[in-house]
């Protein structure tokens, strides 16, 4: 999630302005969480008042966890997005079973089951029923910026290093796991 936010700001505002936006925003950041769902959890428990993260995680906190103190704000200028992926590992011990799983995972039946169990993303599977609650909370598949996945693939490591350098890199607000 953090890498997506960094890429989004740089793509949206340009390289230098995007990094400066994140530096300016940093003045208001108490903690950088380990997980993308962390900000909405921290709002729900009252640990912070604003969080950046995926809208579907916020919906989950409101609907499934009962946090009525969360309000979702969708930027009118558009949001970025992520595309969930699934794959078969090269050399998998059971490739036929893995193929069957992939076929099921990419079926409308499977993604609709996920939506019934707290996964409120918009679906990209043909013929799948979109979770209505996502629209009720303001998610709009037409309000997505033209995200450059190729730029992200080629430059994410550099962008992250530049942002960390600009922020002064790794004080105790950054919740990281030991490598």
Kindly give the residue locations of the regions a language model identified.
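Periplasmic-binding protein-like
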Residues: 4, 21-25, 32, 55, 104-129, ...
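Short, hydrophobic alpha-helical packing/hinge segments within bilobed ligand-binding/sensory domains
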Residues: 39-42, 48, 58, 98, ...
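Beta->alpha turn/N-cap motifs
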Residues: 36, 53-58
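Extracytoplasmic ligand-binding site segments that recognize negatively charged/polar headgroups
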Residues: 1-47
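Conserved C-terminal helix/tail region of periplasmic/extracytoplasmic solute-binding proteins
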Residues: 139-179
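Loop/turn elements at helix/coil->beta-strand transitions in domains of secreted/extracellular proteins
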Residues: 16-20, 46-49, 67-70, 96-98
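A bilobed periplasmic-binding-protein/Venus flytrap-type ligand-binding module shared by bacterial periplasmic
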Residues: 7-11, 82-94, 105, 113-114
